[in-house]
Amino acid sequence: MRLFLALLALGFAAVAAVPAYPQRIVGGSTTTIQQYPTIVALLFSRNGNTFFQACGGIILNNRNVLTAAHCPHGDAVNRWRVRSGSTYANSGGAVHNLNRVRIHPNFNRRTLDNDIAIMRTTSNIAFNNAAQPARIAGANYNLGDNQVVWAAGWGAIRSGGPSSEQLRHVQVWTVNQATCRSRYASIGRSVTDNMLCSGWLDVGGRDQCQGDSGGPLYHNGVVVGVCSWGEECALARFPGVNARVSRFANWIRNNS
């Protein structure tokens, strides 16, 4: 899920991945996995038996999935599974167990800097029209301000509201880094160069939300962000914050 700042302030960054408050798409509409075959649902179990969708992920290749570090951080690898190839959060497609989770070595559980991880599945993800490897932004990917980007996920449809069983998507825009940094500094939060802000600035109503954490932010079909955190969801003053994929291009390549 995308983490609420209230949880961070209480020091719960590590446990939120399951979350008490997972994130979902706000202000968007339903879509299908055929439109976003690079996204997967990450399933979590508290007891090792019953699994439910708690985060999103992005297919890198037939054995590796990119996600937010705060989702699996601190959990045993067998508490997470990957559902690929399904429009629905908790049914359909193929479910894969994991044999490894690699958290970025500089991940900061308090600030959520370097909020990125790679999960390795025990079985191959079969590619078809509902499951495909993503195009990932390279180190020199040029992404300007006010660019149209799209987010997708199964998260909440409003802050604190119910999650969506069907995949949803929403159009938002990239937000100037200095503006985003200033907005969050006013409430004591740090936006680093490893982060990418998006939303509908000064309007609100569109965003990623609880349960969308780890899911993709696309620019012209290229994954440029991984859903990370924000002040509630879809507020006019505070954009959503993603891990900026271009900053991690080499690490992703070397670990997948």
From Swiss-Prot:
EC number: 3.4.21.4
Enzyme category, top tier: hydrolase
Active site: residue positions: H70, D115, S213
Domain of life: Eukaryota
Subcellular location field: Secreted, Extracellular space
Molecular function via GO: serine-type endopeptidase activity
Cystine connections: C55-C71, C180-C197, C209-C233
Signal peptide annotation: 1-17
Predominant location category: secreted
Peptidase S1 domain sequence ranges: 25-256
Catalytic activity, reaction form: Preferential cleavage: Arg-|-Xaa, Lys-|-Xaa
Protease listed as a keyword: yes
Tissue specificity note: Midgut.
PROSITE patterns: TRYPSIN_DOM (PS50240), TRYPSIN_HIS (PS00134), TRYPSIN_SER (PS00135)
GO CC annotations on file: extracellular region
Annotated SMART domains: Tryp_SPc
Annotated positions for site Required for specificity: D207
Propeptide, chain numbering: 18-24
Alphabetical list of CDD domains matching this protein: Tryp_SPc
Listed GO biological process terms: proteolysis
Family: Belongs to the peptidase S1 family.
Name of the featured protein: Trypsin, alkaline A
Species annotation: Manduca sexta
